[in-house]
């Protein structure tokens, strides 16, 4: 409710006598509102007498009125106008109806609202919007058509299209018809005069695959590639899988899988002539996924039935050697063996399920309870089996009681041993010593320590290695030469570089051009008596430097070297000057007379 700014009153009255329809406060008479915005179109008159429209129009997406002509349009409005113009130009070139263009413009506005247009080329976004609208209407236009019209890479448009679908959450986008790809693939395969016939057969194969539920969930390029390959074979044209893969850009395994799925349909069993004449509309094949799952279920069921169909007790005992350990050396019939085998399998499955269900809670306690209970039940079942096959009353009863007592004592001893500190696995509480299903002769098998104890620690001792094994690692002369050629071929560049360095070094030594800088070595105080000459030379050099008062020590060093007899002073100066490039301003012949 409006409030007066002067007297804070809340009662107002509209002055209808005034053209501006002012809103006046009844208490103090202050005008609260004047010149309100109205929806009526009003006209005025200029100083020249021309009639003009008063006011301005504000659209739904505008924040304020536009002033100054067309150049004063908002940036958003200018962007939409440019996009509409470009959409119409592309639609006109590709013969796209106007209603699809309007739908593409709505997709563009939605992309602009989600900040998808910023930072992307406008041509890619426009092509993506048009392609989405065409896919919704199931037209024959493809991305390659927009690419050729806009002169943009089809992969660039495809990447923008995929990002746009993900950004705008575009769902229920109809799949492209494989028959659209068939024409493009046929043009790249160079089918000559049989192109029309191959395309016709491939389209019919695609329609047949669509009826047989092979189209749903598959890439259209894979379906089109398989149809093109079959159509070429139907027309006696030799086209390999590699050629189809290069054209359709799908994997060879995908192409072969489409062919295998089509092989299980009714249309695949017809001849070429019957397939062309008959539409095969009498029945549809089941989806490939349905057939594949039924085959898996049938295979599992057959394997289970085969395992349970034992004719004799020997087959059952050979199938499960643990059952032999449980039943001992008793003579049982086939039905009894199967009965105990079923009970044994059920008990073991329950133990495994219990351990899996309680994984990570307390594996040791769970295993103790399960293993002890199952061990007790197994012992009691042995007693019951023996009682069923032994006749008598008193003796058998006494023997059974004694065996039950033995079972109880054994279980209590096992419990004490487990509590005393037997090793239990920290993950699932497993212990090999208390495993009721462990084979009896497991302790007779050699362990890892037994094998390691036989291996000598001496690396040069090869007594434990057979001669045949050593000979297998030795190459004969032919294999050695072949391996040498391979190594030289792999390292040819390095060998050539090293050889060139060696030849260059020999040539420099022969010509006396030894200008290679030697690495500086750290001087050490050497006081050994086995090098008297170096000490004498150093002392002589120091004396010469002090006599000549040469700060640099160049003359002293040259004279010391000359006295030692290694080379003359002139030769050393020549060698020093030869290190640098030759100069026209130096008379090298005059160097011989410098130190005479």
UniProtKB/Swiss-Prot annotation:
CDD domains: CYCLIN_TFIIIB90_rpt1 (cd20553), CYCLIN_TFIIIB90_rpt2 (cd20554). Sequence repeats lie at residues 90-166, 185-264. The modification Phosphoserine is found at residues 381, 384. One of its GO terms (biological process) is DNA-templated transcription initiation. A zinc finger (TFIIB-type) spans 1-33. One of its GO terms (cellular component) is transcription preinitiation complex. It is found in: Nucleus. Belongs to the TFIIB family. TFIIIB comprises the TATA-binding protein (TBP), the B-related factor (BRF) and the B' component (TFC5). This is Transcription factor IIIB 70 kDa subunit. It comes from Saccharomyces cerevisiae (strain ATCC 204508 / S288c).
